[in-house]
């Protein structure tokens, strides 16, 4: 899809993240496992019932990287844009996933998400003991316009 003239939205920001990840796969082979779980969007009733029966869960974040880094088991990113807000189910899922040892963050834009991914992939293994095995931004945070706030 040609994004040259696309209006910015949560979707286009996420597409930008995925495009960057595709471009950087040789440098970061782990990015081959980054994926989007298409939980969101409007569905007709029959499709919604079918998806629920298949295991769709409300609140699952947009991006998941199931690769342990530092002290974390994996990375979850919920993408937002503009005035987008977290739904109750999203907040609940992110906090629960963080409680199970995942690094979870909400990013308002591709640049913030890419920065988080780069920082996450640069984490050292747990046993180094040098403090470089934790993310600088607190777990379960919201990043917006360079500012960090707790979920």
Predicted regions and their residues:
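Catalytic phosphate/metal-binding cores of nucleic-acid and nucleotide-processing enzymes, i.e., regions
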Residues: 1-151
């Amino acid at each position: 899809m040609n994004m040259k003239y696309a209006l910015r939205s949560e979707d286009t920001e996420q597409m930008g993240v995925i495009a960057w990840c595709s471009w950087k796969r040789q440098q970061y082979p782990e990015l081959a496992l980054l994926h989007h779980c298409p939980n969101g969007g409007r569905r007709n009733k029959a499709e919604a019932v079918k998806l629920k029966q298949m295991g769709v869960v409300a609140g699952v974040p947009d991006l998941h990287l199931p690769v342990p880094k530092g002290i974390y088991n994996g990375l979850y990113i919920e993408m937002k844009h503009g005035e987008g807000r977290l739904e109750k189910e999203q907040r609940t899922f992110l906090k629960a996933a963080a409680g199970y040892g995942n690094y979870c963050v909400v990013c308002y834009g591709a640049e913030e998400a890419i920065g988080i991914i780069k920082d996450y992939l640069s984490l050292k293994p747990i046993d180094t003991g040098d403090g470089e095995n934790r993310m600088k931004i607190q777990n379960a945070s919201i990043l917006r316009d360079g500012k960090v706030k707790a979920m």
